[in-house]
């Protein structure tokens, strides 16, 4: 797990939330929330889903979606 996944996981744990809590509150499947925390991008059906879910999860956890999107794009862009 690198910076992005750790950021999500640490924010969730600091708030005392389980993945089940996050699933209920965001209506995002636990499978996708777990994939965000593990940075397992192949779980998502298309890149648009990973970006949208990343924004939603970041906002829910009180994180800066724009900053995390920049990290995501840097990690996933092709050389």
Question: Which residues fall in each region the model found?
Answer:
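Cytosolic/nucleoplasmic/matrix-facing N-terminal domains/tails
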Residues: 1-79
């Amino acid at each position: 797990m690198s910076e992005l996944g750790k950021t999500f996981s640490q924010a969730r744990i600091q708030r005392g939330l389980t993945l089940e809590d996050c699933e209920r509150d965001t209506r995002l499947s636990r499978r996708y929330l777990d994939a965000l925390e593990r940075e397992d991008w192949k779980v998502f059906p298309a890149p648009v889903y990973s970006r949208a879910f990343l924004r939603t999860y970041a906002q829910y956890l009180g994180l800066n979606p724009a900053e995390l999107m920049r990290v995501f794009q840097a990690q996933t862009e092709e050389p």
